[in-house]
């Protein structure tokens, strides 16, 4: 997939860098696998902002993705690759031998016409989904379940992958891209290979409006606000904020640890790498 830097025919095009994939389907998505997607503007049922920097953006349909990959023993042919506005990875429309169609996260290297499969007896090749106990140690996988049958939760973004480094008893040890080592039940499923669109991080939106198309609103610094809006607000002229960096609600930020999920700490063998 080539990286295309646009000619600066206008100020808004000057810094645009796009990832162009000629293999993507140019028509409409598969209608039976679409669902309505309404926008919240970051508000809850009381109308209050619960998530900042959300609002506007282009209308979208949600593509129903098969994260469980539980149609075992039935081969499926990849009909086409598609763009999905709801995620960074590409998606693949697959047609099973019994005629059912499903969307899956497109693995890197999988193209139209390829045949994929899921289940214990599936061959070891990119795009096939198997329980971790059937995958060779050292393999690169993505779309990994954290609970058997729940559906993939780990490594679903563009270009991501996880390495299976060990198998002991009923658990497998995985090395995540962050450097974290984590135990997962061997019954959980994973898809072989890495996620498509690995050059996604090289793109440049080029202008503020491109973020607005995606429903992302501006981020305002606390020191630019009034005291009523932020702990760093107020003061005459430019100020430093007057205290250690905090969120609008007073919680320390920039490295302050907030994770308190002790229940799953025992599954983490090694913490992620420090930035």
UniProtKB/Swiss-Prot annotation:
The domain of life for this entry's organism is Bacteria
Residues crossing the lipid bilayer are: none
Q: Which Gene3D superfamilies match?
A: 2.30.30.30, Nucleic acid-binding proteins (2.40.50.140), Ribosomal protein L2, domain 3 (4.10.950.10)
Keyword list (alphabetical) reads: Ribonucleoprotein, Ribosomal protein, RNA-binding, rRNA-binding
Q: GO CC annotations?
A: large ribosomal subunit
| Region annotation (Disordered) ranges | 28-54, 223-275
Please give a single GO biological process term from the UniProt record: cytoplasmic translation
Name the Pfam families on file: Ribosomal_L2, Ribosomal_L2_C
Question: What are the recorded GO MF terms, alphabetically?
Answer: rRNA binding; structural constituent of ribosome; transferase activity
Question: What does this protein's UniProt record list under function?
Answer: One of the primary rRNA binding proteins. Required for association of the 30S and 50S subunits to form the 70S ribosome, for tRNA binding and peptide bond formation. It has been suggested to have peptidyltransferase activity; this is somewhat controversial. Makes several contacts with the 16S rRNA in the 70S ribosome.
Quote the subunit structure annotation: Part of the 50S ribosomal subunit. Forms a bridge to the 30S subunit in the 70S ribosome.
Please give the HAMAP family that the UniProt record associates with this protein. Ribosomal_uL2_B
Give the family this protein belongs to, as stated in its UniProt record.
Belongs to the universal ribosomal protein uL2 family.
Protein name per its UniProtKB record: Large ribosomal subunit protein uL2
Give the organism, scientific name.
Saccharophagus degradans (strain 2-40 / ATCC 43961 / DSM 17024)
Q: What gene name does this entry carry?
A: rplB
């Amino acid at each position: 997939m080539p990286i295309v830097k646009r000619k600066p025919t206008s100020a808004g095009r000057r810094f645009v860098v796009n990832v162009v994939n000629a293999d993507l389907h140019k028509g409409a998505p598969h209608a039976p696998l679409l669902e309505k997607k309404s926008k919240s503007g970051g508000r809850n049922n009381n109308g209050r902002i619960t998530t900042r920097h959300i609002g506007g953006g282009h209308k979208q349909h949600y593509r129903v993705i098969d994260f469980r990959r539980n149609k075992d023993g039935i081969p499926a042919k990849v009909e086409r690759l598609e763009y999905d506005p709801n995620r960074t990875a590409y998606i693949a429309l697959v047609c099973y031998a019994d005629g059912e169609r499903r969307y899956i996260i497109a693995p890197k290297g999988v193209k139209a016409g390829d045949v994929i499969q899921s289940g214990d007896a599936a061959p070891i090749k990119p795009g096939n989904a198997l329980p971790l106990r059937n995958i060779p140690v050292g393999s690169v996988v993505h779309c990994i379940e954290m609970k058997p049958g729940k559906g993939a939760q780990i490594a679903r973004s563009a270009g991501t992958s996880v390495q299976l480094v060990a198998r002991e008893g009923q658990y497998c040890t995985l090395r995540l891209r962050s450097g974290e080592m984590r135990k997962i039940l061997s019954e959980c499923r994973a898809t072989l290979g890495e996620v498509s669109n690995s050059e996604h991080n090289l793109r440049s939106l080029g202008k503020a409006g491109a973020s607005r198309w995606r429903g992302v609103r501006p981020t305002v610094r606390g020191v630019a606000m009034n005291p009523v809006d932020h702990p760093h607000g107020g003061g005459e002229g430019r100020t430093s904020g007057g205290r250690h960096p905090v969120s609008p609600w007073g919680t320390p930020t920039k490295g302050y640890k907030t994770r308190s999920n002790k229940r799953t700490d025992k599954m983490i063998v090694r913490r992620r790498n420090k930035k």
